[in-house]
């Protein structure tokens, strides 16, 4: 009781780490004993009912987070009813290693405007903390990894608690914080940011094997990002093994070279105190030299094994035997596992010492499975505690059977005091941390480039140039980015007018301009620029689009991000694209050039499968227009679609357009003759729905050619040739195979639940055809993109497309080789089987 009273320092609003340390120095031995003694669960609350000590409360909450994270997983695997088909899992060991550093962050260090990406395998810890903060329900925790329950990995879109950044594909959430910091810098430089916050990633050390982290690290250095923390849970175990020794020095040098501060939190207070005693220096040297595998094995074996190994290795050195003899086996194990990442005081000291905006990486030494019987074992990643082990832990934590979910059960501080403490935690604001942003007005039409012959890529550049000339809200809120292909994707005109962004106010002189060397590029870099130039790293592109595409929610200021890249290199960043869509980030992806129509460039730069990726990606509407007027219509719609955020859908919205999403535009450098035509409301709607009749079929027509994108000229010529034999044949322009297909599936689902009058756009388009009509589909992509059209009404399909890797050649040569030329289309039309 007397030891406990030592923690009674100040009222919650007046307490501080500095006061605590002064007090601890005066009563060091008693404080040390209290810090590492088991609390008596049957004792009366030891703090007065008026205020509570900060450190004691943090340590109590830390223990509760550990228990809850274990119990959440145990309940999901052993107590909740299941079909028994699959193990539920949940990563108890990975969660345990990060309990202290997460508790220090959320219960003390973070402020409401800070944003956090939590390592995927620590999601039970995150959910437990949110539960204690009042942001998560007991029902959600009990449903962990079940339908409608707390998610296996933190999810912005699936979880009900306060997730800032989704994580799951390791490494991407880490990079996301860097690009979110860049977006915050962008908003700040443009005068739109409100209160700045830190972008924080809690990182599993095995995530540092992910290459995308270093791509992001280098890009962050180029842009001089600020207010960025990466907290490494340095438990030195990956999924399969114990990691290599001596990596930390290499990590530290790498981060230092990128302008980061590196803070290593290696020892807890117990170890620091032991080092100050006779024999302590020898102990420190032994720990520093101990291989990770040996240390992990000793952690698992426990105190007796520690004693034997230490005496064998350094027992002959001065003071060591006396130092080790001071501890019984349990205390020795506690000492040897008292790493910095498991010491609340050490973590608080490290966090609170940083008061500037320099990017900082904390390496917090931890033990995978700390505090659990799984600790240190090399097989613990997927390991689960047995029911008997969990029951022993329950008793040790003083938790009454049946009260396992109670927030403050078993803690030595009165519930009312802990509740008051939690309510006054700086991070635990009652204000919504997800912001709303007013929509950006979009003009009723976008100017269509007037060229009689152009490509969709050229048209895109001219449309953006036209927007750039207008000093309206739309132009101001567009931000563009590209991985070193700004010019070759026709963004150059936009950048000439709107400039490059860099937070530095000092501009680099254009020596070409000063030397009177002519160049089309007049790019000026400034804090007011609207183009973010990236290196050739597609992961960075998609994660930046994710961060910018969530600016309205993260920072309360809406941006309309446009990213450009070569279409085939979507594959290089596909996981990051998936990550962006999974979070419901809003952006326009312009992929150009595309297909084998990029003829001389050869197979390495030609794409065929990307339209299938667009069709398969939730939250992403994929278009492939043929003409400039179609592109203008689609781009205008896209700016509104990015901003749509309806929670519920009105009847008839088969595509969920009222909910909004992102857009993928697959464009081409192939120039084709443009069509002069009025764009009435009906045609505009059909372009957006995904298709329209360029040449309508006669009623009962027996032949249709359906084309997509740049295959329009070949399809037109083939259609002209076929109408001599089949005058009623139709020519279907597909602007979005994705939206036609999604609408068709949605209509089928609606009819299955009784909405029998529901029809899809493609069903209405194909309705005039004869039941035995033949469909010939043509696309500069895999034939499966359009071959499904035959399933709509059970009609025969001859699907033309690209199934092999491309190669260099002229357009006519490649179209003939891959059977996309006029003759091949006509031949397909003539086939009857």
Tell what function each PLM region has.
Residues 50-58, 80-89, 111-114, 159-167, ...:
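Glycine- and acidic
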Residues 199, 204-207, 234, 366, ...:
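Active-site metal-binding loops of divalent metal-dependent hydrolases
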Residues 4-7, 11-15, 19-21:
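Intrinsically disordered, low-complexity segments enriched in serine/proline and basic residues
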């Amino acid at each position: 009781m007397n030891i406990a009273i030592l923690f009674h320092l100040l009222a919650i609003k007046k307490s501080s780490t500095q006061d605590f340390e002064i007090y601890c120095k005066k009563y060091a031995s008693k404080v040390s004993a209290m810090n590492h003694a088991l609390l008596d669960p049957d004792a009366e609350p030891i703090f007065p009912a008026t205020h509570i000590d900060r450190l004691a409360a943090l340590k109590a909450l830390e223990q509760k987070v550990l228990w809850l994270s274990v119990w959440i997983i145990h309940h999901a695997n052993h107590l909740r009813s299941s079909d028994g088909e699959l193990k539920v899992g949940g990563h108890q060991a990975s969660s345990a290693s990060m309990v202290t550093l997460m508790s220090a962050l959320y219960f003390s260090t973070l402020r409401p405007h800070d944003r956090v990406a939590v390592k995927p395998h620590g999601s039970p810890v995150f959910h437990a903390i949110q539960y204690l903060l009042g942001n998560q329900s007991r029902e959600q925790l009990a449903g962990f990894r079940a339908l409608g329950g707390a998610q296996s990995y933190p999810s912005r879109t699936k979880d009900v608690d306060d997730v800032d950044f989704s994580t799951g594909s390791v490494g991407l959430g880490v990079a996301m914080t860097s690009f979110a910091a860049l977006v915050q810098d962008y908003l700040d430089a443009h005068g739109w940011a409100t209160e700045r916050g830190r972008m924080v990633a809690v990182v599993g050390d095995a995530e540092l094997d992910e290459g995308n982290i270093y791509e992001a690290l280098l890009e962050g250095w180029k842009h001089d990002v600020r207010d960025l923390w990466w907290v490494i849970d340095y438990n030195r175990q990956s999924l399969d093994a114990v990691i290599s020794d001596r990596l930390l020095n290499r990590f530290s040098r790498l981060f230092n070279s990128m302008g980061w501060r590196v803070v290593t939190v290696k020892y807890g207070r117990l170890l620091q105190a032991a080092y100050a005693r006779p024999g302590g220096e020898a102990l420190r040297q032994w720990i520093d030299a101990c291989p990770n595998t040996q240390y992990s094995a000793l952690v698992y074996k426990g105190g007796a094994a520690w004693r034997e190994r230490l005496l064998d290795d350094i027992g002959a050195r001065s003071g060591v035997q006396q130092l080790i003899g001071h501890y019984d086996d349990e205390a020795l194990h506690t000492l040897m596992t008292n790493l910095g990442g498991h010491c609340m005081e050490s973590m608080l000291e490290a966090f609170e010492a940083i008061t500037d905006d320099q990017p900082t990486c904390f390496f917090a030494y931890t033990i995978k499975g700390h505090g659990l019987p799984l600790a240190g074992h090399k097989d613990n990643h997927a390991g689960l505690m047995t029911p008997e082990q969990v029951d022993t832990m329950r008793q040790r934590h003083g938790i009454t059977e049946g009260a396992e979910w109670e927030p403050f059960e078993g803690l030595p501080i009165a519930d009312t005091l802990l509740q008051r403490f939690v309510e006054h935690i700086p991070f635990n604001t009652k204000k919504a941390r997800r912001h709303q942003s007013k929509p950006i007005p979009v003009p009723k039409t976008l100017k269509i480039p007037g060229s009689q012959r152009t490509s969709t890529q050229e048209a895109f550049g001219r449309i953006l140039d036209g927007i750039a000339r207008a000093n309206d809200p739309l132009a101001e809120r567009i931000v563009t980015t590209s991985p070193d292909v700004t010019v070759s994707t026709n963004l150059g005109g936009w950048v000439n007018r709107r400039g490059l962004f860099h937070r530095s106010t000092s501009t680099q002189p254009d020596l070409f301009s000063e030397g009177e060397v002519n160049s089309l590029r007049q790019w000026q870099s400034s804090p007011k620029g609207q183009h973010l130039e990236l290196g050739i790293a597609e992961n960075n592109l998609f994660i930046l689009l994710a961060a910018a595409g969530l600016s309205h929610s993260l920072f309360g200021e809406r941006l309309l991000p446009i990213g450009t890249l070569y279409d085939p290199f979507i594959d290089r960043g596909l996981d990051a694209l998936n990550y962006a869509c999974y979070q419901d980030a809003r952006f326009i992806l312009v992929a150009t050039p595309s297909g084998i129509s990029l003829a001389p460039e050869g197979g390495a730069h030609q794409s065929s499968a990307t339209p299938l990726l667009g069709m398969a990606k939730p939250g992403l509407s994929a278009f492939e227009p043929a003409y400039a007027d179609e592109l203008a219509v689609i781009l205008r719609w896209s700016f509104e679609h990015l901003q749509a955020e309806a929670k519920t859908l009105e009847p008839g919205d088969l595509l969920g357009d009222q909910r909004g999403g992102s857009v993928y535009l697959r464009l081409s450098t192939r120039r084709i003759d443009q069509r002069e035509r009025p764009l009435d409301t009906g045609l505009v709607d059909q372009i957006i729905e995904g298709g329209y009749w360029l040449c309508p079929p006669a009623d009962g027509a027996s032949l249709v050619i359906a084309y997509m994108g740049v295959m329009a000229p070949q399809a037109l010529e083939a259609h002209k040739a076929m109408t001599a034999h089949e005058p009623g044949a139709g020519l279907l322009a597909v602007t979005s195979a994705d939206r036609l297909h999604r609408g068709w599936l949605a209509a089928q689902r609606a009819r299955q639940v009784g909405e029998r009058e529901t029809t899809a756009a493609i069903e209405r388009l194909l309705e005039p055809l004869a039941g035995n009509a033949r469909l010939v589909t043509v696309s500069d992509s895999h034939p499966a993109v359009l071959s499904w059209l035959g399933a709509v009404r059970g009609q025969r399909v001859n699907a033309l497309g690209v199934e092999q890797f491309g190669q260099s050649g002229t357009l006519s040569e490649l179209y003939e080789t891959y059977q996309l030329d006029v003759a091949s289309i006509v031949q397909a039309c003539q086939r009857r089987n």
